[in-house]
Amino acid sequence: MELKELKKRLVEVFSKYVPQRIKDLEGCVRAAVLVPLFLKEGCLHVLLIKRAEDLLHHPGEIAFPGGIIEPSDQTPQEAALREAFEEVGLDPKRVELLGKLDEVLTTTNFIITPFVGVIPYPYPFKIDGKETKGLLILPLKEFKKEKATPVNFQGRTFLSYKIGEGLVWGATAKNPQRAR
């Protein structure tokens, strides 16, 4: 598959897709993430981060670049791009945003708006070291539903994917499945 073909297919999909929005809920905080997609060796890949262990929220988890929508962010997209720049050095001008996925409510009361974007690869990523401990570059096919296993957390069951030494689960596990 060529990058031009990938973009064309994704633009077509997103032109027909209406993402589900979650209304503002008391006690919830809005956040945004970037689901960065790229072609590597002709196969669609996704970039994930390993969050630092000393963070207040979701320490040590595997996630997409992203974070809380700050008052200075004019839009959720701006927040997702800002956070991706802060965490992995991804220049917002190098991200081609193609669409939005369904919003996700986490068990920690975040309402996450995920944005799908195509990025160049290879890319000189720069891990910030404060919020991000490492990068994971994975083929999107690793997130097939039949590869998922259930994990229980706070009385709820979530899909999860074993990735090397880590586990992708919760809100992060929902988004690659939707992006496929």
What spans do the regions from the language model cover?
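Acidic/polar loop patches that form or flank catalytic/metal-binding clefts of enzymes
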Residues: 125
